[in-house]
Amino acid sequence: MNVANVPASRIVLLGQSLGTAVASGVAEHFAQEGIDFAGVILVSGFSSLPTMLGHYSIAGYIPVLLPLRSWPWLLDLVLSRIVDKWASADRWRQTARTVKQRDGRLRLSLIHAKNDWDIPSGEDDGLFAAAVRGIVGEGDLVDEDTLAAEKERRTTSNGKNAFVATWKDQDMIVRQELFPYGGKPTTTSGGGKQTRHR
């Protein structure tokens, strides 16, 4: 920002797949410094690496850790060995809380394709819930059922496997958008051909 002489208010952070963890970390760091970006867009994001890997399937077909689900203690042991957790959900809870406390500005957009075979689209639900918990200021006191009902009320369906959920509070907006098809090659670029649809 200083080198290019561009204010944060004119910068949008964009992260895709593993890059969403980096964008989340950058947003959290600068939020703690009192700096708000024009927006943050996370495409195919995930709540944390251990959570995502617990449901990860190669090409959408080969569930890497499925055999370990029969022994939850073993799955927990394997996942506990992950050094870098990339806990984006925790980061967004804290970032939203920090921005809210100082009456700052937040624009977070979560974009995912239902047929993304690398990162399950449900991972965005965790990011959305975490950011909302940071905004409402009750942290973990917002129970799942209440949050789900409130999210449903703020959601517009765009057909099968497609919706937009928007949470607005003062100058803070968290938006989650699900598309039925796209995966990573086509969701962001419009290019690439992804022929396998689930």
Whereabouts are the PLM-identified features?
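Hydrolase active-site cap/lid region
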Residues: 25-97, 126
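Residue-level signal for short, function-critical loop segments
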Residues: 17, 44-46, 114
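Short beta-strand/loop motif that positions the catalytic acidic residue
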Residues: 102-104, 109-112, 116
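Conserved acidic catalytic loop of the alpha/beta-hydrolase fold
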Residues: 1-9
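Gly/Ala-rich beta-loop-alpha elbow adjacent to hydrolase catalytic centers
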Residues: 15-19, 23
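C-terminal catalytic histidine-bearing segment of alpha/beta-hydrolase fold enzymes
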Residues: 117-198
